[in-house]
Each structure stands twice: as structure tokens, then as C-alpha cells.
Amino acid sequence: MDSKSVTPEPTNPFYASSGQSGKTYASVVAAAAAAAADKEDGGAVSSAKELDSSSEAVSGNSDKVGADDLSDSEKEKPNLVGDGKVSDEVDGSLKEDSTTPEATPKPEVVSGETIGVDDVSSLSPKPEAVSDGVGVVEENKKVKEDVEDIKDDGESKIENGSVDVDVKQASTDGESESKVKDVEEEDVGTKKDDEGESELGGKVDVDDKSDNVIEEEGVELTDKGDVIVNSSPVESVHVDVAKPGVVVVGDAEGSEELKINADAETLEVANKFDQIGDDDSGEFEPVSDKAIEEVEEKFTSESDSIADSSKLESVDTSAVEPEVVAAESGSEPKDVEKANGLEKGMTYAEVIKAASAVADNGTKEEESVLGGIVDDAEEGVKLNNKGDFVVDSSAIEAVNVDVAKPGVVVVGDVEVSEVLETDGNIPDVHNKFDPIGQGEGGEVELESDKATEEGGGKLVSEGDSMVDSSVVDSVDADINVAEPGVVVVGAAKEAVIKEDDKDDEVDKTISNIEEPDDLTAAYDGNFELAVKEISEAAKVEPDEPKVGVEVEELPVSESLKVGSVDAEEDSIPAAESQFEVRKVVEGDSAEEDENKLPVEDIVSSREFSFGGKEVDQEPSGEGVTRVDGSESEEETEEMIFGSSEAAKQFLAELEKASSGIEAHSDEANISNNMSDRIDGQIVTDSDEDVDTEDEGEEKMFDTAALAALLKAATGGGSSEGGNFTITSQDGTKLFSMDRPAGLSSSLRPLKPAAAPRANRSNIFSNSNVTMADETEINLSEEEKQKLEKLQSLRVKFLRLLQRLGHSAEDSIAAQVLYRLALLAGRQAGQLFSLDAAKKKAVESEAEGNEELIFSLNILVLGKAGVGKSATINSILGNQIASIDAFGLSTTSVREISGTVNGVKITFIDTPGLKSAAMDQSTNAKMLSSVKKVMKKCPPDIVLYVDRLDTQTRDLNNLPLLRTITASLGTSIWKNAIVTLTHAASAPPDGPSGTPLSYDVFVAQCSHIVQQSIGQAVGDLRLMNPSLMNPVSLVENHPLCRKNREGVKVLPNGQTWRSQLLLLCYSLKVLSETNSLLRPQEPLDHRKVFGFRVRSPPLPYLLSWLLQSRAHPKLPGDQGGDSVDSDIEIDDVSDSEQEDGEDDEYDQLPPFKPLRKTQLAKLSNEQRKAYFEEYDYRVKLLQKKQWREELKRMKEMKKNGKKLGESEFGYPGEEDDPENGAPAAVPVPLPDMVLPPSFDSDNSAYRYRYLEPTSQLLTRPVLDTHGWDHDCGYDGVNAEHSLALASRFPATATVQVTKDKKEFNIHLDSSVSAKHGENGSTMAGFDIQNVGKQLAYVVRGETKFKNLRKNKTTVGGSVTFLGENIATGVKLEDQIALGKRLVLVGSTGTMRSQGDSAYGANLEVRLREADFPIGQDQSSFGLSLVKWRGDLALGANLQSQVSVGRNSKIALRAGLNNKMSGQITVRTSSSDQLQIALTAILPIAMSIYKSIRPEATNDKYSMY
């Protein structure tokens, strides 16, 4: 960036006490500049590392520092004496005032008062000794900075709550630009107006440009114009501050105590921390970007660590105790270990200069602060991953200060425990977990459990670290640097403790602190988790932000993420929250994590209210305190454990709770048990969330903590189905472990939780949650016995797994265990858990005392020569079954037994089957012998063996598979395993000419066999991958490749023997489990593979039942009076009244028919008149003949005699007009219809026949739609009528259709018996196809005449369809209204397997007056069927009309309630041949569809 002429007026946040001498910041800068000038003249040499403004200095190349410079630097370093004073040799280089050097453009330095040589303050290597010789030259003045209020709070916050570490941070944002503040001098005794709490938020914006870096030694300028002065070169210090928000000011190793004067002036450490001010109500509110007073320089980037360069006195300073800095508003409060201020010290510029000199002298690393990313290992000057500026003020021995949490600021010594005094406005907070008290305005505040002495630290709303500059007294307290939010002021030396420090619990290995991974635990058990200061089962989230060059925008205040959900609106005033809580930075922080778990996903047992504690009493009796913040109304569900002491107590309480001991809280205000559920899931951290910042120096998991948490979660005294949650800090990459009752620690990974779940209140109280033993007590004896047997099976299976060398995490084993868990249900307690089964299995196998009672019977089927016997030998490991490569080795069914891993296995070896269709009879005989052996030794597993290298898609094995299914039943495939031998065969070439991959080859061959089995069983649903039989590969060749253990392996690396045995064991265990839990259900072979039992089609059977049927009548030649038709009786009666019409035909004049030659001579009108007269005479003749027939039948009834046998033939059943169908002409069978084509292949002449002489009528059935004209006749139809015992007329009609695929048979047979003149009974037997099954129908009905023109029929039927039986009844009534109109109504019901169908029919028949002479008639019918709640309506119309003398039109139409139906029109004519032109219509439609196919497909389009 361009250099600016900035004139910072120096101020000091560290004020020297009155009476002390010191020098101003300007004097120090001037002295450094003069030293640089003297160096150029060969005089004085700078005592600090030279920070050049060149690119080399920025990049940190150490090559630029010559040996001469280093030696000169060492020579000119201030000599540090034991008391911490600076030797007089340095006086000369620091006395004179200096202006801005001219070498590079630098901000002008306002000259201040000169500082004496003896006033220069340096830090000694020991923490205890700090020079007392530093004083203030002018005691009557001090510097005060009037800083205008920063209006925009967002300028002091890190944008998006994160800091970019992986890129060089260029300060180009206008929002982060700070303004140089005016400086005016005031008396030293004056206090700041804001009680010493000044704050300047931001981050150190390190620019890779270094044009404005002062070249002189000891004086530096950042890209923002900040002046950095290294005041004393000391020994090298290695301060490993690896977390964001960490600032080390002062000694990192020595025992000096850097104190602030008694005037309680403020030490400014603004790390994105807002200042807390007072509002009108006397409560605290976070005031971001307050006017900062007495600040010499302002760091303008968004996460800067600011320390004023005010005058410090060199006095004994003890390490400021780590201060737990308050998080952002909306989070849990932290313990503030109040540290004493720095009574005496040095200016901040001197501190920086000394640290720079140390780094230069000890490590020779020229890693410039302005050079972008600063290495963590550099001594003296550092940047953490949040962009915080870390400076070592003293050169001491190499110390690794591992402050492993964000928001940690290290200022001064760490060795001793001092309490930072506050002005008393902030309530004391101890151990980060404090009870909730009542503030002045009714607001909630934290009351410290333990009295802290003179706390001076203040908490700000932004989650930043601020160190008060008030005077601090040395006290003893425990230091845990590894906790989040800890501020370390002073030096941090490993294993060095202050002499007067009486606390032995100080961490002595600060440099290598094992940071326990914060685990978030949510329980649904019946115990209450309580720590000494904590009264809840809470979530402690691991605060391990990913650090590295690839990390993007991690939030500074990310040490503890809890509280407010809204990251943008989380600025709750201090007036409403006197304790500070962190906010969950989601959305803006770590934007690359898409699967963040919001706050509402984090289940906790306690929730805080900012506007007053509001406890909602749940139905379970447990209180839930909800958050009612002013700006964020989201409920927080998390409790934070931040300190190591709290974590230890928490783990101890977990141990107690896990053993069933209820822990109670000592906090009176929040003593309710608030354990929540997370839906039976256990959430753990992903392995990918490992922090890479510390480079392996610290352990990510505290194994003891993790073990205790897991122990409490996985059944150690917890209630059934105990659930446990371990989550990462930001809720990303969660994995769930569902532990249903009885499964304990069974882990089941789920997909990352992406969507937030709604907040869940407590739904289970302690009274409803029972322990495992109580659950087991509540089980009935029968259930206990089932669970015990199930547990025994589980133990057996686990022992078998152990013997096979497989683990429970194996894919097949995991599926079996999962199914066992589902069958056990959630009622299983700890006694029947998976952990108990695993433990027992391991113990049983280790001891070897308990015998494994498990046996296996395996039936081996397959074609000849596929390797059945060789597979048996390979499994048993011995040459037991004889094998022959050139012939059949197995000629009969035999049993072969052996022991494998302690399991007795019995094989049923069978002879090879043949796949040819002609050999299936031989296969059936062999399979009958197999069936006999199966009755003696029922097989548990069936191995269908085939070769892998001979599979084709021609389905040649289908006849064989169908024979197996027919002989042994479909249940034979229930526990079948497809075993493919010769598995080491090379795959064939694929379509591209290259060999197929092995996996593709195996998959194709497996699918072929599975598909064949599905077709053989007869249900294509077996081709569903979830229902297919498992496939196992086998290679029996002695030269098969082996692994190191000598076990045969396949080309894919699989050990086939153990895999096949595992499949067998798994199917046997699952089969035993099913029979164990459901012994009452009989085996239904129809339900094998999930087959749905087909219910009979009741609507179809009902419609078949409701049809009207004519009763057979005796032929006239057998003396039967078949006059049982009401219509015929009516006609007989009517004929008596029409006797006068009998003479009408006789009264006609004679009529001479004309010949064709004569008709041709007639005109059209004459020809028409002739035909009308001819038709009229023919009709009169037919009427006369009909009446004579009726009279004869009437005489037959009266006389009981046989009349007219010789002169009249009996009109058959076809003449019965009551069915409404046109009467058939009683003529012999005519010639077949014209063929569809007139080619030579149509050999219709072959089927011509003469008039039959017997009652058996046989004719072929032509398939007019077939493609084969020569052999298009694929069926035969036979009809026969006879009289049984000369009394019972009977008819039978059978039609058989057979082709290559189907065989259909249709049979209608009836026999009737008369009951006097008014009644008749008929019985019938029908066979017809219903789908692929044959339905056998036995029916019967009785018809009787109750009125003159009314006839009633009552009937029923029984239908046998497979294993189903359907019964039905019907009622029918027929009434004749005159001679033309007939009404027919029928109703009935059909019932099968508790299912019923109801139906009704109504038909109206209309005939012409001369019926049956005239054939014109019409019928209209309505049908209604109700089945399974569905109502089906249908309408049918049939009409037959004569058009002209020789033309007829037949119309048939049907429509149902779903608006679907059909219309059929038939036209026949022997006069109008032009009617054949109508065939052009379908041809034209076909042509139109071929031209425009889209026109017809639009309405069927799915779019």
C-alpha cells in the first residue's frame, strides 16, 4: 500500500506509577531512529531485529541478515542484570529525540519527552525479577487519546465472523481502516472516563506490501501505520500460541510481574471485544467501538491485539492468571480468573522491540510481522489463525505456550496466578459455570460461587479478550491454558512456578497440554448429571477450528459456540444479559461446511433467559428454562463445559450416573433434571474434523473422557435405548449411532444431518424411563423365553463368525444382526443386548468349555458335471465324495457328513440332472428319491450348483428348473444359494472386443441363473434384486491361487469357502429365528418369497353366475314335452284366439313365382312390387306353420302322446327365444367363413365336411388373427346333446385351444329335470380359465312359474380356484309384458375368504310383433357390481335390425361409470356389395397415423 504520512501521537495504556521515571513512546522511536543512523555511520548498532521494508524482509528470508549484523546486534544489546535493569551501555542509543527517518517514507513521529537511559525498561529472563529502575521522566504528564466513537459496530468485528489465514491479508477494506487519533497530554493521575475499559475491535491486517516499514532497527510500522518498537533484545523465546485471539505481551518465561499502576489504568487488549458500558438502568451493555482513550496507535484490522505503549514501570510482575474472556452475547459465561494489573512495566513499543530483538538474536528468523502469514514457530512476533498479533516482550528460554483455544490472550507472565481486579461493576464469575442471580433491573446475572478478589477484567459482548489495566494482586489459582477463552498475561514458562506460589495444581507442562476434546453429550436416561458447579447434562463442543493455509474465515469467538442462533442479530445488550454467552456463528463462519447443525439441533438440559429466568414445567415434571432474548428468540439447548476442572467433575458425575447413581446439583436455581432425547441417535465426530494446527503436538481426544462418555452412553446403567450425542463444534459432519434396546454399542452411520430439527422438550420423566432390569422385569415369561432363545442364537452366530475369521461389521453379518435386532424389538433390555452377546461369545470361545450346538444340512442340486461333489470335498477339506472328470461319479442320492470348525455339516449329494426337455421324466424320477431323503433329513440350505463359464441367455435350463420346482415345491428356493463353480475362469470378450471385467462377468452370469429361477417359480417378482437368491462363487481346481494362509482365493481376492459358509450360517440362523418367533403360523408355500395369495376374481365369477341360461329339453324323438317356456304357452293361448287368421294364408289368391329371366324383364317398380308380395306370402306361411307347431305341442300336453315325430323334427335349443339371442337356423354346419386372404396357403378346403348324422358335432376353431394361414386352426370345438335315462336332457360343449405357449379348455355342461308343468331344475359343471389357473364351477338353479306370465329362478354356485373356494347365490325374475316386451331382473352375491361382491342386473327386451318369425329385436341392460368398496356401473345396448330384404345391421355398445366402453357395428348384406367399401376406413386411419403419429399421441403424453 502507498505510504502515508501519519503522525501518531503516542499514548500509553500502561501508566507508570507516580514517582517513577520513564520515557515517552516518541522518545523511544527517536532513539531507535538515531541508533539506525549511528549504525550507518559505523557507530551504534540496533539492539533489535532489523525489519526492512523490502520484500525480503516481508517474506521472512533469513538470508538477508548477515553475520556482521547479528554480531553487532548481539554486541549492542542492552545488558540485562539480575534485577531486570538495563545497563548503562544502552543509554547512548536511547537519549536523543528523533524524527522520521528519511530512508523510507514513514509516519511522522511526534517527539515527546526525552527518556533517560536508566528509565528504559527491560524484562529479565526470570519471571520474578523485573527491573525497578524504569521511571517516568515527567510525572506531571500523561498521554490521553481522544478517539472518536466508531459508529459502525461492524467495522470492529470480523466480517462473517472469521479470519482468513491462508491468504496474505491485504488491508484494502475501507471499513477496516482506522483513523489516527489526536493525542493530548494529561496528568499521570488522571483516570480514563470509561473505567479503564477501552476497546478497539479488529484484526491485524497484514499486508504483503511493506513500503512503509521503517528500516531502522527496533522501529517498525505496519501497513496501517502502527508502530512496533522492540525495546530489549533478550534470549530467544518460543511461544506457541496456536489459537485465535492470543496475545502475548511481556515475559513469556521470566518471573517478572508486569503490573499496572495503582491508578487502575487500562491495559488495552482489544481483540474484537466490545466495551461494556452503563446504560440508564445501571446495567451493562456492550458498546462496540467506544471512544478509546489514551491509545497511541490503533490497529485497524478486525482482530488486532492492541497494547498501548504507555509508560510501564519495571517491577516484579507475576504471571497474570489465565482469564476466561467472555464470549459473545448469547453464550455461557466463562470463569474470569481475575489477574492483577501490571504495576510497573515498559511501554508497549519497548515490549515489541524487545521481542523482535529476541527473535533476531536467538533464531535468526526474519519473519516480518508485515510479511503476510507468520509462522507459528517464529519467536518474538506471531500471528495466530485469527490474525491476532502476538509479540514476545522478553527473550527467555524456548517455551511452548500451547493456548489451544480461540479467544485466548496471553499478556505477561503465566507462571503465577494473579487475579485481575475490576471496578466491581461486573459480577464475579468463577470456573465458567455460575448460578443465575437477579440483577437490578430484573435481569439475569451470574453470581460467582467463589469470591474472587478484586476482579478487574470485564466481559464484552463480542466474545473478545480484554485485560483491565488496574492494579492486580498476586493470588494463587489454578491455571488451565488449554481451555477456551483463557487469557494469559505474562510469561508462560514450562515447569517454572513462582516461589511464593503455594498452589501445586498449576499446570507444569503448559507447552504440551493435552487438550481434552470437548464432547457434547445429551442423555435420555433417568439420572441427573451434575458437576460441582454445573447442574445439567450438557454439551461441550470441541473447540478445535481447523487451522492451516486452507482455512477460510473462522470466527474469532469460536471457542464456545452456543446461545443465539442468528449470527447476524446476536448483539444482546448487556442491560439484558449480565453474563456473556457465545453465539453460534453459522452461515457466515466456515461457509464451506454445508451440513451445519444449528443450535436447535443441540439438545441440552438447561436453557437460559436473558430477560428473566422463565421456567416452563413440562408434563414430565421437568423444568425447561427458555431463552427470551430481546433480539434472538431462538431457544438455545446447550450447556458448555469450558474449564478442565468442570470437565473432570463432569466425567466423574458421568461415571456415577452410568452406574445408576443419581447425581444432584448444588445449584439451587437450576436443579431440575433436563435430560432430553435425540431420537435414539448417538452423534460422534467425524474423523475429518481433526485440527491440523498444532502439528501433532497435542492429542485431539482425551481418551479417558471419551471412554467415560461412551461408557455412560452404551448401557452402563443407562435406561433402555439410552441415547448419546457427541457432536463437533460447528455441528458439521455428524454421525449417528442408533442403539435400540439390546444392541448397546452397535454403531450405524447415518448421512450428515443437513436440516435442523425442531426443538424438542422433555417428553420422558424419570418415572417413565426405566432401567434395563426394570424393563426385563416387565416382560412376560413367554417374551423372556423368546428373547433368551434369540440371544442364544445371536451368541451362536457371533461364535460362528469368530471361527470363520469374520467380524460383526462384515456386510452379511451386519445384516443378520440387524434383522435379529428388529425381530427382538425394543423391549429387549441390557440382558439381551448385542454387547452382552458379543461378550458371552468371546468368553465362550476363549474358554472352550461350552460346546457350540449348531449343525447344518445342505442339499446339493445341479446338472451333471458342474462340480457338486468337488464342492463338497472343498468345503469339508477331505476327499470324501468320489469325483470323475470323464463320467458320472454320483449315481444315487447319498449323505456325506463332516465337521468344519466344530460345526457338523451333512451334505445330501444328488446325481446330476439333465437340462434337455426330453429328459425331464428321468429327472422327475430322481427327484422323487431326493424327496424321500429330504423327509428323513430336512435340508436347511439348498445349493443349486452350476458353472460360471457356461451361462448363456437361451434359458436352456428352464425345463430343469421347472421340474425341480414341480417335484420339490416352490419352497425349495426359499433358502437356496446359487453356487457357480469354475469361478477362476477368464471372462469372455465383450461387445467391444476386449475381455469383460470380472465383476461384470459374474454379475451377468448370476442374473441369468436368478432370472431362470424366477421364471421357473412362475413369478417374475423374483427378478427383483431384493428377492433374488444369493450367489456364491466356488473354485475347486487344485491349482487355484492361494493367499499367504494357504486359502483358495478368487480373482477378486475373495476367500470363497468362508464366504459360502457364512451365507449358509446366516440363512440357517434367520430361518431358526423366524420359526422361533412365529411358531403358530403354518408354512404357506404360497407366501414364499413374499408371494401375494391371489384372491379369486369375485366380480367375474358373479357376472358368470347371474347369466340367464336355458334349461335343456328332451328331443322330440325321445318323447319329451319340452314345452316349458312361458312365452310358448302364451303363444299357444294366443293362437286359440287367432284361429281366424289361420285361413288368411289359405285365402290368398294363387301366386306363381317368376324365374330369374322373367324378373330381369320387369321394371324396377314391378320388381319391387313382386318382392313385397312374395315376402308377405312367405311371412304368412311361416306364421301358419308356427301356429300349427304350437297347437301340436298343446295337444301333446293334453294327450301325453307323441305326435308328429315322423313329419317334424324337434327344433333344438336354439329355437328357444327366451334368452334374447337370435334363434339359430337348424341346418347342418355350413362351410367355414371366407379366409382373410386368398393366397395358396389358406387351405380352407381341407376342412369341408358333410351333414352330420350323429348328435356329436365337432368342428375346428380358426384363429383369424394368426399369422399362419396353413395351420391357423389351433383348436377344436365339440357339442353333444343326449337324454340320460330318457328322462333328463343333457348338453355338453367343450372347446380346447393349444399352441406352443398356452393350453386353454372351456367346458359348459348342463342337465335338467322337470317338476310337473311349472317347474324345472338344472345342474351344471363348468371349467374355464381364470388367468393362468383353471376355475371349476358347480352350479344349480330351479325355475318355476308363479304367475301366468312370470317366471322366477333361484340358484347358486361353488367355484374352486386354486386353493380358494368361492360361493354365490342368485335370484332372477322374468316377466312378459305383452308379446313384445320382456323384463328380466337378477341379483346375487359371491363370497370368498371373507371378501364379498354384490351385483344386480336389469334387462329390457323389445321384439317385433311377428317374433320369432321376424328377427328384429333390441335389448338394453344395466349392471351394478360392488366389491371392496368400489361401485362399478355398466350399461349395454344390443340391437339387430333388418335393412331391406337381405341386409342386417347389428349394433352393440357398452359404457361403464369410468366413461370407458366400446361400440361394435356389424353389417351383413347379400344385395349391396358396395358395403365392402367401408374397409377403406381403417386403411385410411392407418395411413393417417403413419403420416402424423404425434396427432394421436398427444392425449396420451405423460407431459
Curated annotation (Swiss-Prot):
For bias kind Basic and acidic residues, which ranges apply? 85-98, 176-210, 447-456
The question of whether Calcium is a record keyword is answered with no
A GO CC annotation given for this chain: chloroplast outer membrane
Q: What class of enzyme is it?
A: hydrolase
> Could you tell me which residues carry Phosphoserine?
S71, S210, S281, S288, S448, S461, S589, S609, S630, S632, S665
Q: Which domain of life is it from?
A: Eukaryota
What remark does the entry make about the cofactor?
Binds 1 Mg(2+) ion by subunit.
**Which residues fall in a compositionally biased region of kind Polar residues?**
1-24
Chain intervals for the UniProt region annotation (G1): 862-869
Instruction: Name the residues that bind GTP.
Output: 865-870, 884-889, 982, 1035-1036
Q: Where in the cell is it found?
A: Plastid, Chloroplast outer membrane; Cytoplasm
Q: What is its main location?
A: plastid
Question: Which membrane topology describes this protein?
Answer: Single-pass membrane protein
List every stretch annotated G4: 981-984
Query: Where are the stretches annotated G2?
Result: 889-893
Write out the GO MF terms: G protein-coupled receptor activity; GTP binding; GTPase activity; metal ion binding; protein-folding chaperone binding; ribosomal small subunit binding; transmembrane signaling receptor activity
Please give the Gene3D superfamilies that the UniProt record associates with this protein. Answer: P-loop containing nucleotide triphosphate hydrolases
Where are the annotated segments for Disordered? 1-210, 298-338, 429-464, 610-633, 1203-1222
Alphabetic keyword roster: Chloroplast, Coiled coil, Cytoplasm, GTP-binding, Hydrolase, Magnesium, Membrane, Metal-binding, Nucleotide-binding, Phosphoprotein, Plastid, Plastid outer membrane, Protein transport, Receptor, Transmembrane, Transmembrane helix, Transport
Question: What cofactors does this protein use?
Answer: Mg(2+)
Does the keyword Zinc belong to this entry?
A: no
Q: What biological function has been recorded for the protein in this entry?
A: GTPase involved in protein precursor import into chloroplasts. Seems to recognize chloroplast-destined precursor proteins and regulate their presentation to the translocation channel through GTP hydrolysis. Required for chloroplast biogenesis. Probably specialized in the import of nuclear encoded photosynthetic preproteins from the cytoplasm to the chloroplast.
How is the quaternary structure described?
Answer: Homodimer and heterodimer with TOC33. Part of the TOC core complex that includes 1 protein for the specific recognition of transit peptides surrounded by a ring composed of four proteins forming translocation channels, and four to five GTP-binding proteins providing energy. This core complex can interact with components of the TIC complex to form a larger import complex. Chloroplastic protein precursor such as prSS (precursor of the RuBisCO small subunit) interacts with these complexes.
Its family remark reads:
Belongs to the TRAFAC class TrmE-Era-EngA-EngB-Septin-like GTPase superfamily. AIG1/Toc34/Toc159-like paraseptin GTPase family. TOC159 subfamily.
Protein's name according to its UniProt entry: Translocase of chloroplast 159, chloroplastic
Species this chain originates from? Arabidopsis thaliana (Mouse-ear cress)
Q: By which gene is this protein encoded?
A: TOC159
